[in-house]
């Protein structure tokens, strides 16, 4: 069984308390539980990780690329938080690792402040989804299953 990696970036550990009018009252633990349950329905194990550090996210993306080559990983659902709008390094990591990525955002970033309208992740991602709340993670997992190329173990 191939797995799926869900990566959450800076400040997503504060879900449930940070701007609940924007992000809702669900916690990161709720997100991770939802993702594991949806993964099980889809026939994939889901691993969830969160970091406030860009370099850690990059290291995980590199690891994911190697796991994809081995046929162990289908791809990544990535909510890079504010790094979406600033990180060329995450863009380059995704491109370099050749791992299918669905970029996801809990809020509709395009209806928010102008600085949130540009994504450095989007050009490297297979698809971009936003504004569906925490429940949208389940949809992002389904999207990844639909668009990721089939993998064979090397």
UniProtKB/Swiss-Prot annotation:
Transition state stabilizer (site feature) positions: 18
Alphabetical UniProt keywords: Amino-acid biosynthesis, Aromatic amino acid biosynthesis, Lyase, Plasmid
Enzyme Commission number(s) from the entry: 4.2.1.10
Coiled-coil regions listed: none
Any one GO biological process: aromatic amino acid family biosynthetic process
Active site: 23, 105
One Pfam family recorded for the sequence: DHquinase_II
Domain of life: Bacteria
Molecular functions (GO terms): 3-dehydroquinate dehydratase activity
Pathway named in the protein's UniProt entry: Metabolic intermediate biosynthesis; chorismate biosynthesis; chorismate from D-erythrose 4-phosphate and phosphoenolpyruvate: step 3/7
Function per UniProt: Catalyzes a trans-dehydration via an enolate intermediate.
Protein family: Belongs to the type-II 3-dehydroquinase family.
Name assigned to this protein: 3-dehydroquinate dehydratase 2
Species in which this protein is naturally found: Ralstonia nicotianae (strain ATCC BAA-1114 / GMI1000) (Ralstonia solanacearum)
Gene assigned in the entry: aroQ2
